[in-house]
């Protein structure tokens, strides 16, 4: 056991992706008036909560991770950390993260983090991931919480913008996850995990990917139409979303499903990154947007 194991088991890549969306929500609510001390506390607090959830997930999935090529080298599978130590580590990370959000931000942001944590660890990892084709749908709620946490840490209000962020990022999770399940089809089959491509076929997953990307595109526009983001954000959201939709539609004539799914997955990362950045740099008040439309 080494320091490397303590880092690896938290899934740093997932933490980094969540930090981007936290920042997007935070700067969207800040509207150019950024409290950097609060920002740092929110980023660290959310990262600790996400890390905690990932460690618990590693503990829960250790019996199926060894069956999958993608996860067979994880710390718990390789015996790099004992189960009791991992559980203690996960608990300490969670307590630290929730406490930081509650004390340095506000109870609302801590509550949002708690909901995401319960959904991911309890409903998804412990239950639905292994039992239901709808596990991805339920799990998407946890993946959508980080931008909401960032937004509520500033606004201290679960308003229309928070709802829009929750819907946007939940919808984004679905095609993103289905694409992974397609190009990792053999892994999920070997572990007997009933993701949509395994349970109902790749064609069914392709149809769902197109529908969810379309819904995502429409949802992204609501931040501008609702008066929370500017026209620059709108232009980027529309361009990225429509190209992602075009790419998703291409799945119907793809000769290599795995190659196509990897492209859809890769562009999903670019899309959510671009939107997170634009939410921060082009946030504005409803009055600003209305004045722009009126000119």
UniProtKB/Swiss-Prot annotation:
Coiled coil: none annotated. GO terms for cellular component: plasma membrane. Pathway: Porphyrin-containing compound metabolism; heme O biosynthesis; heme O from protoheme: step 1/1. One of its GO terms (biological process) is heme O biosynthetic process. The chain crosses the membrane at residues 9-29, 36-56, 83-103, 108-128, 135-155, 163-183, 209-229, 230-250, 264-284. PANTHER family: PROTOHEME IX FARNESYLTRANSFERASE, MITOCHONDRIAL (PTHR43448:SF2). This is Protoheme IX farnesyltransferase 2. It comes from Pseudomonas putida (strain GB-1). The gene is cyoE2.
